[in-house]
Curated annotation (Swiss-Prot):
Keywords: 4Fe-4S, Iron, Iron-sulfur, Lyase, Metal-binding, S-adenosyl-L-methionine, Thiamine biosynthesis, Zinc. This is Phosphomethylpyrimidine synthase 1. InterPro entries: ThiC, ThiC/Bza_core_dom, ThiC/BzaA/B. GO terms for biological process: thiamine biosynthetic process; thiamine diphosphate biosynthetic process. It comes from Methanosarcina barkeri (strain Fusaro / DSM 804). Catalyzes the synthesis of the hydroxymethylpyrimidine phosphate (HMP-P) moiety of thiamine from aminoimidazole ribotide (AIR) in a radical S-adenosyl-L-methionine (SAM)-dependent reaction. It comes from the Archaea. Its EC number is 4.1.99.17. Pathway: Cofactor biosynthesis; thiamine diphosphate biosynthesis. Substrate binds at M94, Y123, H162, S184, R185, G186, N225, G226, M227, R228, E264, Y291.
């Protein structure tokens, strides 16, 4: 039985107990969430992974994406990025390579970390077709499903699969047009294949067969967002919503067959539309875990898109988004390097926490309360221990060391907190 089927039979599995302990919640709450499709717990029969729950009532989780490109193929560097992402606090990792030996590189990455690892199988299928036949449009349907199964057997825990692109979605896209084009690589591959071959998307047409593969290998389905906007002016358009409707219907079908499902959301969304997107997705999908790719709230800050994303991600999480894909400073410019990956994870972890302070004020604000008291008391060691990045905080302070060890060089002898502590008591 799958974990969904266990949960629906009233069985609390070891994975549910681990999530409950990690979140400080009752195991029965986790079981009910998995049974209803509101919580997923990625696992694999092929490898031991760090158990992580994603969904309603749980802390907002952060995914880091890595992977070689056709221009830069350095498997060892991708392993270092994966390990750095885990060390920086990423909850999951997606390996999205589009160059080199797909399975060999992915296996190397999977074997190097304990996190759940996700992938996009159609990248491999389409790019191998281009290598073999000279064009992505010559890929066969069998090759697409074989790539999916091959990646599942490696121990891939969740897969972004572009199930919601079909002929109806395509009609909406062509009729409405786009200011920023189609930014999803998977969406670009699949729509090009459909138009050239005059056929339906095989992932949609053969959805039940796809679900059989995922169920056999205990892979979480993440319904790919191939119609997401690549510019804020295209956000929440007809093609995006059409795909969401289809993916929500397919998510229900997969869950009824015992497969865990995450529904993916958009990546470029102006701030005033974030709440609408989260609420709409949650209602349409029956409150399945919602995964947002960023989101970016403006398009004019290349080089600073990790900051743009932190703004959007914190608001998304506050409205109920469960799962955030990080964005690095290299977004829209280059393949991220090691430092970009670390910065992306840290920035998104901050955003997730900020959102959780709104979603779960009783639970998520305890660390901030402790930090406030530590600052009041000028307890620097306590401040470091509570910081999201203790080593960075120490490094910054020590690089400009104060004469007075109680204060910092911002205020020096005129530290407001020290003055108050010397003259009266504000402890609470």
């Amino acid at each position: 039985m799958t974990i969904v089927e266990d949960a629906q039979k009233g069985i609390i599995t070891e994975e549910m107990k681990i999530v409950a302990k990690d979140e400080g919640l009752d195991p029965e709450f986790i079981r009910r969430g998995v049974a209803a499709g509101r919580i997923v717990i990625p696992t694999s029969p092929y490898r031991q992974v760090k158990i992580c729950g994603i969904g309603e009532g749980l802390r907002t989780k952060v995914n880091a994406s890595i992977g070689v490109s056709s221009d830069i193929v350095d498997a060892d560097m991708e392993v270092k990025k994966a390990q750095a992402a885990e060390a920086a606090g990423a909850d999951t990792l997606m390996e999205l390579g589009t160059g080199g030996d797909f399975l060999a590189i992915r296996k190397k990455v999977i074997d190097s970390i304990s996190l759940s690892v996700g992938s996009v199988p159609l990248y491999q299928a389409f790019i191998e077709a281009a290598r073999k036949y000279g064009s992505i449009v010559d890929m066969t349907e069998d090759e697409l499903f074989k790539a999916t199964e091959d990646q599942a057997k490696l121990g891939t825990n969740f897969m972004a699969i572009h199930t919601g692109i079909n002929n109806i979605t395509m009609d909406r896209l062509k009729a409405h047009g786009r200011y920023g084009g189609l930014c999803s690589r998977g969406g670009a591959f699949m729509t090009s294949w459909m138009l050239h071959n005059e056929k339906e998307n095989p992932l949609y047409a053969n959805f039940d067969y796809l679900v059989e593969i995922l169920k056999e290998h205990e892979v979480v389905l993440s319904t790919g967002n191939g119609m997401r906007a690549g510019a804020v002016h295209d956000a929440t358009d007809r093609a995006q919503i059409q795909e969401l409707i289809i993916n929500s219907e397919l998510a229900d079908r997969a869950h009824k067959q015992g497969v865990q499902v995450i529904v993916e959301g958009p990546g470029h969304v102006p701030l005033d539309q974030i709440g609408t997107n989260v609420k709409l997705m949650k209602e349409m999908s029956g409150h399945k875990p919602f995964y947002m790719l960023g989101p970016l709230v403006t398009d004019i800050a290349p080089g600073y898109d990790h900051i743009v994303t932190a703004i959007g991600a914190s608001v998304s999480a506050s409205y109920g988004c469960d799962f955030l894909c990080y964005v690095t400073p290299a977004e829209h410019l280059a393949l991220p390097n090691l430092e970009d990956v670390i910065t992306g994870v840290k920035t998104s972890k901050i955003a997730a926490h900020v959102g959780d302070m709104v979603k779960y004020p009783d639970r998520a604000r305890e660390q901030d309360l402790a930090m406030g008291r530590a600052r009041r008391d000028l307890d620097w060691q306590k401040m470091y221990s509570l910081a999201i990045d203790p080593e960075h905080a120490k490094e910054v302070r020590n690089s400009r060391a104060p004469e007075d060890s109680d204060a910092c060089t911002m205020c020096g002898n005129f530290c407001a907190l020290k003055i108050v502590n010397q003259n009266y008591n504000l402890a609470k």
